[in-house]
Curated annotation (Swiss-Prot):
Pfam families: Velvet. Residues 1-13, 24-38 have a biased composition (Polar residues). This is Probable velvet family sexual development regulator LACBIDRAFT_317102. InterPro entries: Velvet, Velvet_dom, Velvet_dom_sf. GO terms for cellular component: nucleus. The lineage of its organism: Eukaryota, Fungi, Dikarya, Basidiomycota, Agaricomycotina.
Length: 345
């Protein structure tokens, strides 16, 4: 049966109904009559990530919108950060943001209809941020798809003098991984947020403090796959430690609040593909810029462009591609000149 918490919240009593005396039963009913339960339950913040959200303020005020984030270009490698020679991840990670309008007459109330004209979206106030997680080398040789559910933990991220409440998801795993997660030495299921193969990524393993550069970026609207698209480009991101990692991307709008909420809500998130960060001596060099990187640069996104591959020059080696002026990285006309520091040991 239901009894009432001293603060007015109801909960199910563990005492069987027939063990309560009649006055206690009557008092319980009287208290419920005086303090009826709320008809609508507030969904935990974490459960709202990637799900339809009814906005009270912002550009979607009065609408129910679902946001979706996916990585369209992952980093392959990076060189361990050094103050004298800072090298960002390459190629630059890029994520795409899509919005879906949920209407009463939609057959699929969870998915909705994608917004057609992203030129009409107000990008001022939209931000994306990243977190860094380590990944064992053997766990990502064959990645398997995962499904995402969400826990109720809400870590606070600080940006200047403002604190933003963000929610952490929890990811369900394949059967084999779930059985592995139940072993005594495995991480707590409440801490698991994602799977790479059979390896569980946990919130407590986060090493975001090892990221250097722009961890919060603003969007750009470009032509991608034949239509205007909102993207976030992390072109100035380096890692201070060696190893294999992945990025978690999150997006939020500082001017939008959902109904009955005052917290800054993460609208969507996704996990990127693994990449490796090398020491200076082991760094193999950089490939020519990808077609997507060059395409984004033509749309005015500030990026480093390489026309040819740049291999690491070894000691005593002559005729390295680094000596070829065409192999030098260059910035687009909207950016400043790129650091031409050598890859020499």
């Amino acid at each position: 049966m239901f009894t009432t918490h001293p603060q007015g919240r109801s909960y199910r009593s563990s005492v069987p109904h027939h063990h309560l005396r009649q006055p206690e039963i009557q008092n319980s009913y009287d208290q419920h009559a005086n303090n009826p339960p709320r008809q609508t339950r507030r969904r935990p913040l974490a459960d709202m990530i990637g799900h339809p959200i009814h906005f009270l303020t912002g550009q979607f005020a009065g609408q129910t919108i679902r946001a979706e984030l996916d990585e369209i270009q992952k980093a392959d490698l990076g060189r361990k950060y050094a103050r004298v020679d800072r090298r960002p991840l390459d190629p630059p990670p890029v994520v795409r943001l899509r919005y879906f309008d949920i209407r009463e007459d939609d057959v699929d109330q969870e998915r909705g209809t994608e917004i057609k004209n992203y030129d009409e979206i107000q990008t001022i106030g939209l931000m994306s941020t990243v977190d860094l997680f380590p990944v064992p080398n053997e766990s990502w040789t064959s990645r398997s798809p995962t499904q995402t559910s969400f826990s109720s933990s809400s870590p606070t991220l600080s940006n200047g003098n403002e604190n933003f409440m963000f929610s952490s998801p929890q990811t369900s795993s394949p059967t084999a991984a779930q059985s592995q997660a139940s072993t005594p030495n495995s991480p707590s299921s409440n801490d698991i947020i994602h799977y790479v193969g059979n390896h569980a990524i946990t919130e407590s393993s986060k090493v975001t403090s090892s990221l250097v550069g722009a961890t919060f970026v603003q969007p750009a609207i470009v032509d991608y796959e034949g239509k205007k698209t909102i993207i976030f480009v992390f072109s100035d991101l380096a890692v201070k430690i060696e190893g294999t990692f992945l990025l978690r991307y999150r997006v939020f709008d500082i001017y939008s609040r959902p109904r009955d909420r005052e917290d800054l809500l993460v609208q969507a998130e996704c996990y990127g593909g693994p990449f490796r960060v090398y020491s200076t001596k082991e760094f193999p060099g950089l490939q020519a810029s990808t077609d997507l990187t060059k395409h984004l640069a033509r749309w005015g996104v500030r990026l480093n462009i390489r026309e040819t591959e740049r291999k690491r020059r070894k000691k005593g080696e002559i005729g390295s591609p680094l000596d070829d002026p065409k192999s030098k990285r260059k910035r687009t006309s909207l950016g400043s000149e790129d650091d031409e520091a050598s890859d020499e040991d």
